[in-house]
Amino acid sequence: TTRHREAEGSSYYRHYYMGLIRADGQPKRALSKFAQYTPELGICQWFHFEDPRLDDGVAWLKRLGVKHLRTGLSWADSHREHADAWFDRQMKALENFDVTLTFCFTPESCGKRPHHTSPPHCPEQFAEFCARMVQRYA
């Protein structure tokens, strides 16, 4: 079980570095095996809000030969101060990858329950967030 560092969007922490890099930055044994399957095999890599490891993560992805990347932008994070600046930085760092972008995590204030997995009170608000992100980064 993973303890959450933050109430919203905390699953980012469980996905960091694809399970291929230790928290201290050292490669795990699986890293060399994974590299045998790139670029055909893509990877899911999440970066949490203002993740200080973004640049290192992108460098590892490039070093591994990753071309196809699934990542996400958090609706919950969009309610934070400087969210667009973070999203811009993240998407700029990932621009050389074939990105499949997902939208996730309900802000506590917008959910039927105060939880990042809660359905939104107003689905149209989530749709507006998705549309804004697609217009900004497509």
What is each of the regions a protein language model found here?
Residues 2-44, 52-61, 85, 98-100:
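Aromatic-rich peripheral "rim/lid" segments of glycoside hydrolase catalytic domains that contact
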Residues 2-3, 46-49, 74, 104-106:
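Active-site beta-loop-alpha junctions enriched in small/polar residues
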Residues 40-52, 115-123:
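Active-site mouth loops of central-metabolism enzymes
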Residues 58-138:
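Substrate-binding cleft and catalytic face of glycoside hydrolase catalytic domains
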